[in-house]
A protein has these predicted regions:
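Small, basic N-terminal interaction modules of short regulatory proteins
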Residues: 1-43
Length: 43
């Protein structure tokens, strides 16, 4: 499982979206106030 902060995700969106879909990874996006989000591939 990957973990990335919101700013890094925003700056490198294509890279992380490709990594999630190509490698079937699940990604946690860390945000302020512990309002984290999980991103996963639909496939």
């Amino acid at each position: 499982m990957l973990a990335v902060n919101y700013t890094n995700l925003r700056d490198n969106m294509k890279h992380y979206m490709d990594q999630v879909t190509d490698d079937y990874e699940t990604m946690i996006v860390t945000r302020k106030n512990n309002k984290n989000v999980v991103i996963l591939s639909e496939e």
